Amino acid sequence: MSAAFPPSLMMMQRPLGSSTAFSIDSLIGSPPQPSPGHFVYTGYPMFMPYRPVVLPPPPPPPPALPQAALQPALPPAHPHHQIPSLPTGFCSSLAQGMALTSTLMATLPGGFSASPQHQEAAAARKFAPQPLPGGGNFDKAEALQADAEDGKGFLAKEGSLLAFSAAETVQASLVGAVRGQGKDESKVEDDPKGKEESFSLESDVDYSSDDNLTGQAAHKEEDPGHALEETPPSSGAAGSTTSTGKNRRRRTAFTSEQLLELEKEFHCKKYLSLTERSQIAHALKLSEVQVKIWFQNRRAKWKRVKAGNANSKTGEPSRNPKIVVPIPVHVSRFAIRSQHQQLEQARP
């Protein structure tokens, strides 16, 4: 394998003006014909079967020579077909300096520019053994031409595979690399979405106690012993969201009739039993959890009012002398009147 590299390296290092350029044509015996125009490099590696912009007419091989003479002449000119990965040698220099390669390709008159069909046949050699059974494919020149046509069709499919199997080498085509990058970016984009969704679910579960709770923090601080009489508010909030089917952050929109009945029940009885709660929820077409949380919030407001009244009675300078509890307009006059009576009775 190492003995196949010196001919190509010698060809690249040999002065360009020499008439005895090492090429397939010189091996066959016909003199190298000068190309009609300069070889325009299209940006792809020389062994890929992409056609250049200017295609010089290839010299036909002499029919007098047998096919056996053509077969051993191909491997020395194209030694890289025997090595699929091409980690060292001429192709590694291609990866390091593409500008030098393009200039050499443009100035060579008869070496590579005069044999595009051999390039296609060589590329077909590299791509064809995977889908086709190897061995007897390259015994005849007709097989080379058929494989050259097949290599064109296989190039688009094999390019994406090369981008993953041999991404470090020069053979990875631009299409395969772009597809590989697109897949990686899609994976990277999918992962943060999954993380954000899981984080949002966790955050909703952690902060589910905020749903429909306006004064729950003050309620916990003022009366820690009262928590034994009630179920934890977080489980109640989770139950309310599952029963109502609404978003966790959205408040429950009570109607004026529902608020009126709830205010009446609260002034009659501050704490409800399970049967009373179920009856009120059934009558108002609410869930028991919604009724329970409304009563918790209402008790928190009521205790804040009581705390303000106690401070004013004892003569201690209260930080908030007047606690105004906002009551909606559609609440009954009975509830408003009872609030005013409590505030007036608290004053000396």
UniProtKB/Swiss-Prot annotation:
Compositional bias of kind Low complexity: 231-245
Keywords: DNA-binding, Homeobox, Nucleus, Transcription, Transcription regulation
Pfam families reported for this sequence: Homeodomain
Entry's Gene Ontology cellular component terms: chromatin; nucleus
Keyword Transcription regulation: yes
Keyword Transcription tagged: yes
Residue segments, region Disordered: 59-81, 111-139, 179-251
CDD domains: homeodomain
Positions of transmembrane segments: none
Listed name of the protein: Homeobox protein GBX-2
